[in-house]
Structure formats: structure tokens, C-alpha cells
């Protein structure tokens, strides 16, 4: 997934997910999301800045926690 994201960044498509936007819309924080997922806050921060991407299973869990569809979390 990292190589895929790197190649997309190289071609100018850097924002792959909208996790940060949806967190703001739902009035939640990245810290809260990290706690709910049992993940390191630095990992969630990387997702929010699009410097790395969650796997599909995690993205599904994020959607569930934020009461939205996966399609709402991706560009």
C-alpha cells in the first residue's frame, strides 16, 4: 500500500482519504479514533495527513466508528 500511495503522490494525487474531514464533520478527534481502534495516535495522524493509508479492514472499522460509508472516507 505504501508503494501505491507513493506512486499516486508522484503523479499529483496525494489526498487519498478524507478521514480528517469526516472526523471534523463528526466532531471527533484523531486521538479518539486511535483509542477506539487501539492504534498509535501517530499512525492515525499519518492517515489524516495522507502520508500513509489504512488497509481496507481498518477503513471499514473507521467508517463504522464514524457512522458513515467507506465511500465517504475516500476521494
Question: Model-derived features: where do they sit?
Answer:
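Helix-turn-helix DNA-binding elements, focusing on the entry/boundary residues of the two helices
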Residues: 30, 41, 56-59
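Recognition helix of helix-turn-helix/homeodomain-like DNA-binding domains
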Residues: 38-54
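A short, Lys/Arg-rich alpha-helix, primarily the initiator
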Residues: 2-29
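Short alpha-helical "recognition helix" segments of helix-turn-helix
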Residues: 33-34
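Helix-turn-helix/winged-helix DNA-binding modules
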Residues: 25, 51-54, 65
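DNA major-groove recognition helix of helix-turn-helix/homeodomain DNA-binding modules
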Residues: 57-72
Amino acid at each position: 500500500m505504501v508503494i501505491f500511495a507513493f506512486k499516486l503522490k508522484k503523479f499529483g494525487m496525494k489526498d487519498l482519504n478524507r478521514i480528517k474531514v469526516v472526523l471534523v464533520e463528526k466532531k471527533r478527534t484523531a486521538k479518539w479514533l486511535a483509542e477506539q481502534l487501539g492504534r498509535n495516535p501517530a499512525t492515525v495522524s499519518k492517515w489524516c495527513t495522507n502520508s500513509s493509508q489504512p488497509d481496507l479492514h481498518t477503513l471499514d472499522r473507521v467508517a463504522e466508528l464514524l457512522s458513515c460509508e467507506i465511500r465517504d472516507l475516500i476521494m
